[in-house]
Amino acid sequence: MEEIQQEEKKHNGNDIFHIKEKIYEMILYGNPQLKDFPKAERYVLAGDIRKTMYTMLEMAVRLEKKYHKKTTLQDLDIEVDVLRNLLRLAKDPNLYPNQKPCLDFHTWEVWMRKVDEIGRMIGGY
């Protein structure tokens, strides 16, 4: 019984470490994209996206330290959904009809793949 608990703890710790690393990689990809946002959204929408990514990283660090992870995982899943919606808004051409979207389709697609992978990791936990 004790061996099973130790193996489970080891496995869960690795999963959280991988989630944290994926969030870190996403931040490294996303931050340079945010500086190219139009001035009108650079400090609002881009700031919200940046804040959400940093909140996700903070939650992943908290997950490493907690024994009971369910509520923190649920909160992290909510942040993933918030980020998905913020990125969707950033790529929407109707946000500013007379301007190009804050994110081009390719950048949005790559970023969303990273977010979706994190979401799948959380869901599989």
Cite the ranges covered by each PLM segment.
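Amphipathic alpha-helical assembly/interaction segments
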Residues: M1-Y125
